[in-house]
Amino acid sequence: LEYNQDNLTDDMWGYNRYTKQEVRIASAFFQNEWKNKQWSFLLGGRLDKHNMVDHVIFSPRANLRYNPTENMNLRASYSFGFRAPQAFDEDLHIENVGGTVSMIELAKDLTEEKSQSLSISGDLYHRWGDFQGNLLIEGFYTSLSDVFALRQIGERDGIIINERYNEKGAKVYGLTLEGKIAYRSLLQLQAGVTMQKAEYKQARAWSDDETVPMEKKMFRTPNTYGYFTLSYNPFVPMTIALSGTYTGSMMVEHKAGFIDKDIAVNTPDFFELNLKAGYDFNLYKGITMQVNAGVHNIFNAYQSDFDRGAKRDSGYIYGPGMPRSYFAGVKLSF
């Protein structure tokens, strides 16, 4: 059994917006698992009563595992989830679009967003002398109904009002590959890539300009993204870490103001590479001091087309969070 309560008060006198929200969620969770060395089957569910939803929501889940060999795991899982029709952090943000402030309001008939997810995966392990490796292959499919979306419904006191409402549905599906290989305690490499497609079940209008084409694809969801981390310990106190993140091209909204007309922009892809080196000093009886330094975003992969001026679209931001930067630090461990 579980009970959560959250009280939110957010008053913006300058914009004449006052938010007072009380969220109460009473939940009960149950599950049972049957297993032996080769098989396992888990069946469970969760009951949630949210004070902003007029009915109890049942969220079932199931998981099946099969181990044909000691070094192979095969899994299939199903789960149901929901998101309540309440104000979240992003709904409280104020944006500047074309010199005009925009805010988000919840539609009066907003209902909960529901999701059903299915995944199938294979997990392989192997050892070759001093090397050991792991490979994960996973396919996934998620169907969303009554999905939350935004639409511009007009202006009030010079403020653009965007309404959060329920779209008919959306789906996200794809494939994830992840691998790890290690050589003793000297070297470890881990990498992964996800190829996916995320789209609404019907094309939707995202601009109040009727001449702007509707879009079926979800904004800010790249079809491909991935990462890698490489750690090297040449000797015990010294650690060198190289990491990278790849973000494929995605579609982003660009609102008029700095530009003449709303457009959907296909962004370039980005590869962000980071390097960090650290050295540990044993100071006294279990007290360790680490001195580290490195570089974030070595190749300076960064957005190059920011809007400027009073009429800029403050929401038109994508890609890595910072340009190339250098850092140094000291950490004490007790």
What are the language-model segments listed below?
Residues L1-N4, T19-N51, H55-R61, R65, ...:
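Surface-exposed extracellular loop regions of Gram-negative outer-membrane beta-barrel proteins
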Residues L1-Q5, L43-L47, A76-F80, D89, ...:
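Transmembrane beta-barrel strands of outer-membrane/channel proteins
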Residues K20-A26, K35, V56-F58, K114-L118, ...:
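Residues that define the transmembrane beta-barrel architecture of outer-membrane proteins
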Residues N32-N36, L47, Y66-N67, F80, ...:
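Residue-level signature of outer-membrane beta-barrel architecture
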Residues K35-S40, G139-S143, E163-K255:
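Gram-negative outer-membrane beta-barrel transporters
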Residues Q38-F41, N71-L74, W128-G133, S185-L189, ...:
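Repeated loop/turn-to-beta-strand initiation elements of outer-membrane beta-barrel proteins
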Residues N67, R75, D109-Y165, K171-Y173, ...:
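Membrane-embedded beta-barrel scaffold of Gram-negative outer-membrane proteins
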Residues T247-K255, Y279-F334:
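C-terminal beta-signal and adjacent terminal beta-strands/loops
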